Amino acid sequence: MFCRQCEQTANPCTKLGVCGKQPDTAYLQDLLTYALQGLATYAKEALKESSQTQNVMKRINKFTVEALFATLTNVNFDSEAIKNFIYEAVKLRDELKQMGFKVQETESCKFQPADNLQELVKQGEEANQKIFHSSSNEDVQSLKEITLYSLRGIAAYTDHAQILGQEDEKVYAFIYEALDAMQRNGDLDFWLNMVLRAGEINLRAMELLDAANTGRYGHPVPTPVPLGHKKGKAIVVSGHDLRDLELLLQQTEGKGIYVYTHGEMLPCHGYPELKKYKHFYGHYGTAWQNQQREFAQFPGAILMTTNCIIKPQESYKDRIFTTGVVGWPGVKHIKDKDFTPVIEKALELPGFTEDKEDKTVMVGFARNSVLSVADKVIELVKAGKIRHFFLVGGCDGAKPGRSYYTEFVEKTPKDTIVLTLACGKFRFFDKELGSINGIPRLLDVGQCNDAYSAIQIALALSKAFNVSINELPLSLILSWFEQKAVAILTTLLYLGIKNIRLGPTLPAFVSPNVLKVLVDNFGIKPIKTAEEDLKDILR
């Protein structure tokens, strides 16, 4: 086993994943990546002949992003599911091969999977070497890994957008090109360019997802979300998938069940077409890494959509369900989006026995809401009432050091605005920061993919002030954990955004020389202490 794609490991995981991933599953995910490389070599050419291959490529595009997504941290731990992805990748590759496309074949184009799990794992060990030790140049290898992890993040956003009918062929074209290129030679400049192109494509993937979400559910509006609960049967939904939540809300309507969000589903309360459901009540719990404790205490059924799942405890294993690409061995998977088993389980369970009043948090400050008061914001900046903007967001995690983000937000001066997004917000989402002339000082922009919204807000402000983004009174204080964060970081680099503070630790897959390039060219810096960083930013 050799896995270093997430923030939890300072050195590669070699015996067992810090995330709970077993070595066999890790090797199968490596083998799936290898099989996808072979598929990509043919798909890259087939996509150019879209008039002849439209139907088959529609299936392959959908499959490829799902399969890549399944290899992202905390998504799919089910070896049987990964095995099926491997077989399907080879089947689709051979389907394209039979269509006669001329390609420069690599070893992965000829790969034949074993017919049993044990032998597949052995093949996965070989694939691991080919993927993660393919270059003797550690800097090239580092950039290859940044590209691969970015592809996994891009695939996640593309999958969500695709489900809601938003696609762009150039996203798939890049995925195939990059997967194919990983098997071939390329120097440092080639891979630096590939990383920046990944950022460009991820921006497009996030734009598609933004269009998908707002097109179907409306633009988020400022909405108070209760952190308490209602007496009655209950289902909590975690993950990121708005369509799954919508389907569950439709299927639970009139059944006497309250639906709650968990983790990154919190921003869903701001979407008009979701908040209209009267039984869609409030938010339960905090970020993904606390789910074992929080789910054990939840008196209803649990639905995991996409990531982030961690090993279910026995106390709730019989009442947690997965859907989409997420999976865990022994946990019931809802493949067809008929959530009857979830609903039946919720009706069996006691639910909450009494109402509980608690504080509320505000969501819904995506680009449309913020830009609707842009004139007021600009006036306040010009009048000196808003001195600085901070974007404090990204992934949360269990590793020590993340209290920095809580402390940073708490210490921001009263004439500053904090925008936040993704699950990193749970370090401070319920803090009372007050407001500036009616504008809340803490603005929740949304999920991690809503980095697109934050970028649009920054671009609009830079246009209004007639300066570049880097000249705005804006600082980015980011926390990372998994591959979607890597993809977002490459997008920020592609846009030329500088002086990003990144933590709680720097990625293990970034070599010293690559880090030097990022520091010298983009001013990326590790976080220090909240006090030091605030002093440096505001001096």
Swiss-Prot record:
This is Hydroxylamine reductase. [4Fe-4S] cluster binds at C3, C6, C13, C19. Its main location: cytoplasm. InterPro entries: HCP/CODH (IPR004137), Hydroxylam_reduct (IPR010048), Prismane-like_a/b-sand (IPR016099), Prismane-like_sf (IPR011254), Prismane_a-bundle (IPR016100). GO terms for cellular component: cytoplasm. Its cofactor is [4Fe-4S] cluster; hybrid [4Fe-2O-2S] cluster. Keywords: 4Fe-4S, Cytoplasm, Iron, Iron-sulfur, Metal-binding, Oxidoreductase. HAMAP family: Hydroxylam_reduct. Binds 1 [4Fe-4S] cluster. Binds 1 hybrid [4Fe-2O-2S] cluster. One of its GO terms (molecular function) is peroxidase activity. It catalyses: A + NH4(+) + H2O = hydroxylamine + AH2 + H(+). Belongs to the HCP family.
